[in-house]
């Protein structure tokens, strides 16, 4: 029963993609970097890493823990084009997605970087950014979490905010740290290329597909909170997530680091 439901939801998703391929120009990425701590004035740590079929990005926290990093700058990981900059609410809060083009093995490839739970958005959709551009500030997802940055790098540029319609593994996502470590310095940064745009579902298709999936869950999946061992939990697509903290994370909050380190240069990660 579940497969036909997913197929129909996928059809709804596909049907709401703009049929004509639109493009915009952007500078090739000359390298990718960590999105926090660029000025070296504060230390950060990775509180939660990428886990296929689980946590689909990385959570970066200030070394002081708690909300000590609230309002700290968030920087664009590479040259790119802002394709999403809105308050998505739910478990996300303010979100920015930037589309990047880079040269690898003679081919032009595309990825999206996502910056979630922002306190402030400082860029607009359609804006072209350079690596290190301040695009927002670290937030709490409207008070849902201790302040931190949720950071993703996606190889599938159709996802947008509709993650439930795509594989939750390496077919869709990169491990952000591994991706950046392998691409800190790239050639072609002065070259301008075209990138696909408007690859996400439009708002109507978004709502229709999500409404269908919500109303037709099979196998006991739920989209309203239930109690499990005294905790409010949600079930979506066979996965459990906390109704109190939102669908991005498990119900565990980021922990204090065992040690902290400067992250303005990614070489620091290699020696630790």
Listing of model-derived features with the role each one plays in the protein:
Residues 1-4:
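Positively charged n-region of N-terminal signal peptides that target proteins for export
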Residues 7-15:
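Bacterial N-terminal signal peptides
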Residues 9-10, 66, 110:
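Short, functionally important structural connectors and interaction interfaces within domains
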Residues 11, 49-51, 89, 106, ...:
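Sterically constrained small-residue positions within well-ordered secondary structures
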Residues 18-94, 131, 140, 174-271:
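Surface-exposed, glycine-biased beta-strand/turn segments
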Residues 65, 120-123, 134:
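A broad detector of the eukaryotic-type serine/threonine protein kinase catalytic domain
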Residues 69-71, 77-122, 147-152:
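Zn2+-dependent peptidoglycan hydrolase active-site motif and core
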Residues 94-100, 127-190:
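Conserved, short, structured surface segments that act as functional micro-motifs
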